[in-house]
C-alpha cells in the first residue's frame, strides 16, 4: 500500500487531498479485527481492495475564527476504483461532521458530535448512517 495526504490551513479553513494505491494478490488484510490506519478508513467504507486506487478530498472549518470556539465542521469525499472482485468495481463515500465542545463553565469538556455517512459500492449494498456521539474530556494530570 502506498498512501499520502496533504492539507493546507488558513483562517479557520483546512483543505486537503490524498491518494492511495494498493497492489498485490489480495486486499489489505485485517488481523484480529484490527483497524486500517490510513485516511481511507472512512466511516463505512475501508477502500482497501486488491489493486484499488483511492483519492480523497476534504474540507474543515474551525468556527473559533468567527468567535465561536469549540464548534467545528468537516466533510470529505472518497472515491475508489479499479478494485478487483469477480469484476473491476468501484466505491465512494461522503462524510460530514458537525461538532461542539463546551469551552467553559459547569459542562466544560462536554461534547456532541453529529455525523452523516453516505456509502455506495459495487462490492456490497449502499449504506447511509446518521450518528450522534456524546463525549466528555477529563483532565487526568
For every predicted segment, state its role.
Residues 1-3, 20-22, 62, 76-80, ...:
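Outer-membrane beta-barrel pore domains and translocons
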Residues 33-41, 77:
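Flexible, solvent-exposed coil segments and beta strand-coil junctions
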Residues 11-12, 64-71, 103-112, 125, ...:
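Short loop/turn motifs that connect adjacent beta-strands in outer-membrane beta-barrel proteins
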Residues 2, 46, 51-55, 90-94, ...:
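Residues that define the transmembrane beta-barrel architecture of outer-membrane proteins
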Residues 6, 15-17, 59, 73-75, ...:
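Membrane-embedded beta-strand positions of outer-membrane beta-barrel proteins
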Residues 52-104:
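C-terminal hydrophobic structural anchor segments
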Residues 57, 96-100, 126-141:
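Outer-membrane beta-barrel "beta-signal"
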Residues 1, 41-46, 81-86, 119-122:
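Extracellular loop and loop/strand-boundary signature of outer-membrane beta-barrel proteins
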Amino acid at each position: 500500500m502506498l498512501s499520502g495526504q496533504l492539507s493546507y490551513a488558513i483562517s479557520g479553513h483546512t483543505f486537503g487531498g490524498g491518494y492511495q494505491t494498493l497492489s498485490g494478490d489480495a486486499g489489505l488484510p485485517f488481523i484480529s479485527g484490527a483497524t486500517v490506519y490510513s485516511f481511507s478508513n472512512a466511516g463505512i467504507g475501508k477502500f482497501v481492495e486488491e489493486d484499488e486506487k483511492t483519492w480523497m478530498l476534504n474540507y474543515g472549518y474551525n468556527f473559533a475564527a468567527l468567535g465561536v470556539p469549540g464548534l467545528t465542521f468537516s466533510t470529505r469525499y472518497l472515491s475508489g476504483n479499479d478494485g478487483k472482485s469477480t469484476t473491476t468495481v468501484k466505491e465512494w463515500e461522503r462524510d460530514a461532521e458537525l461538532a461542539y465542545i463546551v469551552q467553559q463553565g459547569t459542562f466544560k469538556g462536554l461534547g456532541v458530535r453529529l455525523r452523516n455517512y453516505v456509502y455506495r459500492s459495487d462490492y456490497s449494498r449502499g449504506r447511509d448512517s446518521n450518528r450522534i456521539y456524546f463525549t466528555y474530556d477529563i483532565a487526568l494530570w
